[in-house]
Structures are given as C-alpha cells and as structure tokens.
C-alpha cells in the first residue's frame, strides 16, 4: 500500500463518483495512466477526510493498494496542474492513525465582535453532542459526540481566520460552527453562552445552517506517518496559488474602486 499526501483547490468534490469528476477520480486516473495502479484497485482504501465541493485541502491523505512506488512529477503531469496536487507518498503496511484534523476558515470581516467570538468559541472546545451543528447523514448511523481540541481566532482588516482542531468531525460540522460564531460576532444571538449550551444539548433539534464551503480548507490531517514532500510538485502548487492570489488582489482593487465611487 501507498499513502499519498494531496492538496486541491475546492473546484471538485472529493469522493469517487460515477461521473468520474472528483479529486479521487482524477488521482486514480493519473495513476492508471502511468501504469502504477490496476483498474480493480482504482478506489482508494482510505482517506483522511471527505470534503464537499468548494472545500479546499492542503494536507489530506488517500491510500491505494499498489506495489510500485510512483514518480510524483510524472503523476502530476497527468493531472495537468488543474487544481489537484499529489505532494508526497510513502509505502505503508498498515493504515495511519489519525492524531487530529486541522480545518481553517477565512471569514470576511464585516465589523464582527471578534472578542465575543473568541469567548463563545471556548464553550465549544471539549467533548460535546454536536448533532445540531451537523448535517444528518441518513445513510449512516454515527455517534454525534465529538471532541474539539482547540479553536483559534485571529483577524485583520479583511478576514477573520478561524482554526479548528479535532480528531474527527460530523458532516458540515465545521461550517455550521463557523456560521454560529459569525452570527455571534454580528450580535445576532442575544445570549451566546446560553444558546451554545442549548444547541449542544439533545433537547434542541432545530439545527443550524452552514457557512459557504468556499472559505474552508483542510489544512492538515496529522497522522503517525511522515510523508516526504516532492519539492517540484510543491513549487508548482505554490505557483498556482500565487497566481490565484494576484488575480484576487486585482479583483479586490476593482471592487474597492467601484464601492468608493458609488
């Protein structure tokens, strides 16, 4: 087996689908084209975290049943630098043990009360019943109790950056936590501490809406396995994101001009 550290920019959903246009499908097809993977083994055996379309990743993992170590620049050339990167790989005998997952959300700063958000986030840290802050997956029966290790919040003129650390998360759990903290920062919730206590209880069943997927990135899935990063692929990833940043900064300048002149 080989474990791969992968990154992607959110344009695609993650898990293998019949239409073949997902992160896993793209990587499987690249490995098949290079002759490293048999068609019967095209579905990954393991992944570090299933993400929805719109969510990016810098440190997700997938595992394939294969015998030959791949040359990553060759695999990456098959991916055509189109929003999916295979950063590193390593041969393994057993599945990795996950220590924690680290998600980050960049929220537009619209005069939020950041200190109030920080205070409220402390009530979410620890082991709680998070069913009301998740999307119910009717196809699976999952324990809604999860443990958050830490939440860090920082801000600048444009963004509020929220980092969330935990061993595992329910479907849409991070995005709903972000929406809750954002609404608290906008003073939309009268008594934040009391409401958090209510929404983390089994007596509450109304749920809570999620924030948009586009602001979320899976920064890392920390495991007991260290994977060496290919310097060439990493450089290509940085070049791609720098290009996106430059385009976004130009767009930001245009937006500021229009808003200041109207």
Curated annotation (Swiss-Prot):
Keywords: Isomerase, tRNA processing. GO terms for molecular function: RNA binding; tRNA pseudouridine(38-40) synthase activity. It is an enzyme of class 5 (isomerase). Substrate binds at residue 103. SUPFAM superfamilies: Pseudouridine synthase (SSF55120). The active site is at 52 (nucleophile). The keyword DNA repair does not apply. It catalyses: uridine(38/39/40) in tRNA = pseudouridine(38/39/40) in tRNA. Its EC number is 5.4.99.12. InterPro entries: PsdUridine_synth_cat_dom_sf, PsdUridine_synth_TruA, PsdUridine_synth_TruA_a/b_dom, PsdUridine_synth_TruA_C, TruA/RsuA/RluB/E/F_N. One of its GO terms (biological process) is tRNA pseudouridine synthesis. The keyword Isomerase applies. PANTHER family: PSEUDOURIDYLATE SYNTHASE, TRNA PSEUDOURIDINE SYNTHASE-LIKE 1. Formation of pseudouridine at positions 38, 39 and 40 in the anticodon stem and loop of transfer RNAs. Belongs to the tRNA pseudouridine synthase TruA family. This is tRNA pseudouridine synthase A. It comes from Methanococcus maripaludis (strain C6 / ATCC BAA-1332). The gene is truA.
